[in-house]
């Protein structure tokens, strides 16, 4: 596995642990539909939380959350629609970004709730 894939997996694992500690139930990880992949699908109370994880070894070239582009958002929305229909869910949906980045010798996590709107 390429080093950047290892880093991405590390960031996703940290994010799952982070969310669980905050009381989220993890429903799926790396859920795919067509060309879209949702990193984490979680639930907290009556909210379905769709989480895009962005991991960077440094923030020299920009914050991780800045790398979630409109095309990615469109793919996520299509995938979420399919997930909700397939699982017959009636929940509020929220899109979050978790940024994982290295600062000095340790990794930091930032959680951006309601990071973007799909309507």
UniProtKB/Swiss-Prot annotation:
GO MF entry, a single one: nucleic acid binding
InterPro entries reported in the protein's UniProt record: Restrct_endonuc-II-like (IPR011335), tRNA_endonuc-like_dom_sf (IPR011856), UPF0102_YraN-like (IPR003509)
CDD domains: PoNe_Nuclease
HAMAP family: UPF0102
Record-linked PANTHER family: UPF0102 PROTEIN YRAN
NCBIfam families recorded: PRK12497.1-3 (NF009150)
Similarity comment: Belongs to the UPF0102 family.
Name of the protein: UPF0102 protein FP2501
Organism: Flavobacterium psychrophilum (strain ATCC 49511 / DSM 21280 / CIP 103535 / JIP02/86)
């Amino acid at each position: 596995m390429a080093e950047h894939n290892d880093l991405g997996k590390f960031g996703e694992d940290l994010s799952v642990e982070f969310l669980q500690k905050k009381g989220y139930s993890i429903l799926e990880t790396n859920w795919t539909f067509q060309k879209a992949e949702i990193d984490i699908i979680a639930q907290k109370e009556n909210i379905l939380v769709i989480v895009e994880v962005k991991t960077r070894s440094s923030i020299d070239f920009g914050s991780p959350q800045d790398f979630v582009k409109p095309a990615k958002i469109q793919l996520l929305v299509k995938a979420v629609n399919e997930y909700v229909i397939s699982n017959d869910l009636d929940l509020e949906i929220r899109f979050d970004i978790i940024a994982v980045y290295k600062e000095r010798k340790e990794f930091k996590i930032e959680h951006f709730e309601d990071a973007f709107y799909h309507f």
